[in-house]
Amino acid sequence: MSFYESVFIIRQDVSLNDIDKIVDDFAKIIKDNNGTIIKKEYWGLRTLAYKIGNNKKGHYYFLGLDITGNVKEELERKMKLNENIIRFLTIQADSISSEPSPILKNQSTENAPVIDVTINN
């Protein structure tokens, strides 16, 4: 098993309940393949650097994972097939910090409330 960090951007018009369903689908894939979600953070609805399709904003979500390479490939395949996900990036990491990410630390509570920050060790 290896550590991975994955960030994905969900279309601006998707509801928070639907975002939870998307993340739950990814969590099911991970758990079914003996992986672990170490950390998950909702970074809020943020303005994109440039327009992607008809989207000027997007919901940003971060996952810290302990999974195998095969699970990473399956997650990325599901992200590509999900029409609500407009961009994603998954990288291998040396470890997953138990601290909140710098983006979450700098985030104003007025701009985007934190839905869920979970750290499992």
Swiss-Prot record:
Q: Does the keyword Ribonucleoprotein apply?
A: yes
The UniProt entry's GO biological process terms, in alphabetical order, are: translation
Q: Which GO terms describe its molecular function?
A: small ribosomal subunit rRNA binding; structural constituent of ribosome
Matching entries from Pfam families are given as: Ribosomal_S6
Q: Which UniProt keywords apply?
A: Ribonucleoprotein, Ribosomal protein, RNA-binding, rRNA-binding
Would I find Signal among this entry's keywords?
no
Gene Ontology CC terms: cytoplasm; ribonucleoprotein complex; ribosome
Q: Which domain of life is it from?
A: Bacteria
Q: Which HAMAP family match?
A: Ribosomal_bS6
Could you tell me what this protein does? Answer: Binds together with bS18 to 16S ribosomal RNA.
Recorded hits in PANTHER family, A to Z, give: MITOCHONDRIAL 28S RIBOSOMAL PROTEIN S6, SMALL RIBOSOMAL SUBUNIT PROTEIN BS6M
Q: Which family does it belong to?
A: Belongs to the bacterial ribosomal protein bS6 family.
Q: Per its record, how is this protein called by name?
A: Small ribosomal subunit protein bS6
Phylogenetic lineage: Bacteria, Pseudomonadati, Pseudomonadota, Alphaproteobacteria, Rickettsiales
Gene name, Swiss-Prot/TrEMBL: rpsF
